[in-house]
Amino acid sequence: MNPLRKKRLLIIAALLAGVGLAMTLALGALKENINLFYTPSQIANGEAPLDTRIRAGGMVEKGSLQRSADSLDVRFVVTDFNKSVTITYRGILPDLFREGQGIVALGKLNAQGVVVADEVLAKHDEKYMPPEVTKALRDSGQAAPGGSSTPAKQG
């Protein structure tokens, strides 16, 4: 093989190896940051993976909020009106968090079927509902409380 061709081949091989390594690192980083959304029905049916960060959303059941007297631990139940799932959270809940309203909790599902959340997001106003929660309620045949919901703008 000609030395010039050999040098070009080595350069091309090195570039391809570098691009492959960069793609592997980028996809690995993206995989760690992906949080798939699951409804309470999907979680109760075992579709959500254990010990993997997920987003769980639905309506907070009225009367389900339990606060610890001596810590910031909170426990509540979220429903899609078909099935329910318990969520635990340690921290201060958002000011807009209310029973009977939509939320999205980010956390991990444990072996007992409880979502241990490290972040809780509440809806912004009376008519706003997270798009995932709106879709989940529509799929379950339920309407959002208080009339129609306004989904977030896409784009």
From Swiss-Prot:
It is found in: Cell inner membrane. The chain crosses the membrane at residues 9-29. It comes from the Bacteria. Heme binds at H124, Y128. InterPro entries: CcmE, CcmE-like_sf, NA-bd_OB-fold. Keywords: Cell inner membrane, Cell membrane, Cytochrome c-type biogenesis, Heme, Iron, Membrane, Metal-binding, Signal-anchor, Transmembrane, Transmembrane helix. GO terms for molecular function: heme binding; metal ion binding. Residues 134-155 are annotated as: Disordered. One of its GO terms (cellular component) is plasma membrane. Residues 1-8 are cytoplasmic. Heme chaperone required for the biogenesis of c-type cytochromes. Transiently binds heme delivered by CcmC and transfers the heme to apo-cytochromes in a process facilitated by CcmF and CcmH. This is Cytochrome c-type biogenesis protein CcmE. It is a single-pass type II membrane protein. Its main location: membrane. Residues 30-155 are periplasmic. Coiled coil: none annotated. The keyword Coiled coil does not apply. The gene is ccmE. Belongs to the CcmE/CycJ family. Pfam families: CcmE. GO terms for biological process: cytochrome complex assembly. The keyword Transmembrane helix applies.
